[in-house]
Amino acid sequence: MHILQVITGATLVSVPFVSAIPSSTSEFLPSTAEQNSAVLHSQGRSPPRLWTRLRDSIIETIWRVPSRQHNPSRIPSSLSIPRAPSSIRARYGDDVVLRFTIRSQNDVQALIEASNILFLDIWASTNEWVDIRLAKDVVSSLLGLLPSSLRTAHVPIIHDLAQAVYESYPQPVSSVPNPHHAFSPSVQQSSETQNIFFQDYQPLSVIIPWMRLLASMFSTHVRLVNLGTSYEGREIVGFRIGVRPANADLPTERRKTIVITGGSHAREWIGVSTVNYVAYSLITGYGKSRAITKLVEEFDWVLIPTMNPDGYVYTWETDRLWRKNRQENNLQFCPGVDLDRTWGYEWDGSDSRSNPCSEDFAGDGPFGGRESKVIAQWALNETNHHNVTFVGFLDLHSYSQQILYPYSYSCTNIPPTLENLEELAIGIAKAIRLTDHEHYDVSSACEGSVSSHKKRRGAALRSMQSAGGSALDWFYHDLHVRYAYQLKLRDKGGYGFLLPKKNIVPTGKEVYNAVLVFGQFLLGRGAQDIDWEGDFQFPAHSRPNVPEKEYRGPDEEYEISNQLEDDDNENDTLLGFRTQKV
């Protein structure tokens, strides 16, 4: 067992748990299924090996982890999920989430106007539907503002938001819930169910020590970068993964760099976890996977798990559904700006975006958000003074399962590299689909999700959430990043921002495979002698029969024959598109 597995588990145990629900942590109880599963594991597991017993003994002694000996008879035979406590009920009341089916641009405009009047929280929108959060007693007011075509074109997707929020929080742990698996945070297929870090969402107080641990353990190709400080003084930390010439902080040639970000909107926890998953896969795959080794040698990868640390902490401590950052505004009772509306390119402060109480408040001017400003300054400084050329940008959000390319601010202005943007986006969508059969739509960020038959008819509708001032447009236009995308991750609305923890690893695998496709495309001809498909990660239930391989170093040559068929049973290979050397 790798020593990293031991230390990482111990780090997670030793970091105090950040209470997700103030004053009510004692009300968390594991589900019946989880407890029964724990009993079955304890009864059916073979005795641990000597090294395992020694390892656990050391950890238990140093970090005072309780012994794994327990009495299964003390576990209740039947437990139901408790009702949300009063603190949650007081905040979310009788709120629900409704999905409206849209059929025309008039429907979109009507929903925009009504939502602005009532200051409603638009959760997500596509070319076919819009999800809106509102109190039950506001439903009649909303319907009264809508045309007849929309008054019956809606269904509830979350009936009791307070209960859904309560059930989305991780349960506090005073000890390791399953000590046999506690110190094995590998992302390898065989250890998927034993990975303690990715078994649940993690607070910032756990993420930062975990990042420092990885940087110290893999110092040959990993270091932490501090991009600046947030409004409340927290460091905005990222991984820089890449192999540079020895003792050369300033490379002689411009270093091609790819940026992957998450957590711009605080409530989108799956984006934070997915950035961490991809980072871990790149870090631990170097020297073992020929594909990853090539990517780490040819590019620097800067991965920023949360661009909005203040907002992210606030979602753990106070309001799970907080979206904006936490800076003060002219209205003291409506703090925060939507960071993804504050970037400098085509900033738009009109309509609801000029109201500090709006969920998409764009601030008082370009770069009015503290965090977007410092990240932009960092990127410009890297370009102007550190010989860096940014060649790729992936901004992870949730939800609705979409791959969006520039522009967000306009559907009439066409990006000059549209053909290449669409080609790579389709390749990314295909990689995700082959991972776990999840379908991601591809479109311009100014539109909703556009199916192919609607696109042929010219029926694309402008998205309710498209706007100027996005990170996507700024990186593409102002920083001249040729391949910039926003990925809206799982799901399509069953849970929305409250995606259950069982989706963390599958979503991570989807985006990891997408990153492989992304890097392969940017490598151009240099990628042609590598079996990229052989390095794909698959969930256990959908993993194809491919031969196992072991890569012992950057110079080792090997050949593996493996062809994957797509969902339409076509005979083309997954990565059969044209590559583009950048």
Swiss-Prot record:
GO terms for biological process: cell wall organization; proteolysis. GO terms for molecular function: zinc ion binding. It comes from the Eukaryota. It comes from Coccidioides posadasii (strain C735). Residues 1-20 form the signal peptide. This is Inactive metallocarboxypeptidase ECM14. The keyword Cell wall biogenesis/degradation applies. Its cofactor is Zn(2+). Keywords: Cell wall biogenesis/degradation, Disulfide bond, Glycoprotein, Metal-binding, Secreted, Signal, Vacuole, Zinc. Residues 21-172 form a propeptide. Belongs to the peptidase M14 family. Pfam families: Peptidase_M14. It is found in: Vacuole; Secreted. Binds 1 zinc ion per subunit. Gene3D superfamilies: Zn peptidases (3.40.630.10). Its main location: other. Glycans are attached at residues 381, 387, 571. Zn(2+) binds at residues 265, 268, 397. InterPro entries: Peptidase_M14 (IPR000834). Residues 200-522 form the Peptidase M14 domain. The keyword RNA-binding does not apply. Substrate binds at residues 265-268, 323, 340-341, 398-399. Disulfide bonds join 334-357.
